[in-house]
């Protein structure tokens, strides 16, 4: 009924469409995994049910809340309404400090305690790496 050229054209278009759909799917999956979405301590406190999935908690490191004990770091993240205690094992980023923004990735023990597996320190829009600042200062 249809000629050989029409069948080949249909197969070619079907393969292109399948490739485009697969590419879009893979890009969206990649973006979903890399988007840095986090919940504030207030959002954590308002949770009805705690799940066992890995989540991110973000806010400011409360002043005078950092306690370093050998390989563990304990600190408090606040959104100035509520607070959550964080326990992290490992080295913290260079930008990690009291009064600075931070995102902790890990698991909730309960609505007040969080075990972090990764710490991401945030910086403001004026941040400049020391090497760049030094290079610009010389000129």
Curated annotation (Swiss-Prot):
Residues that span the membrane, as ranges: 10-30
Compartments where located: Cell inner membrane
Membrane topology: Single-pass type II membrane protein
Alphabetical list of SUPFAM superfamilies matching this protein: Heme chaperone CcmE
Keyword Heme on entry: yes
GO biological process, one term: cytochrome complex assembly
Keyword set, alphabetical order: Cell inner membrane, Cell membrane, Cytochrome c-type biogenesis, Heme, Iron, Membrane, Metal-binding, Signal-anchor, Transmembrane, Transmembrane helix
Residues noted as binding heme in the record, renumbered to the chain: 123, 127
Keyword Protein biosynthesis assigned: no
Recorded GO MF terms: heme binding; metal ion binding
Cytoplasmic side: 1-9
Periplasmic side: 31-139
InterPro entries listed in its UniProt record: CcmE, CcmE-like_sf, NA-bd_OB-fold
GO CC terms: plasma membrane
One Pfam short name: CcmE
Family the entry assigns: Belongs to the CcmE/CycJ family.
NCBIfam families per UniProt: PRK13254.1-1 (NF009727)
Function: Heme chaperone required for the biogenesis of c-type cytochromes. Transiently binds heme delivered by CcmC and transfers the heme to apo-cytochromes in a process facilitated by CcmF and CcmH.
Protein name: Cytochrome c-type biogenesis protein CcmE
Organism: Pelagibacter ubique (strain HTCC1062)
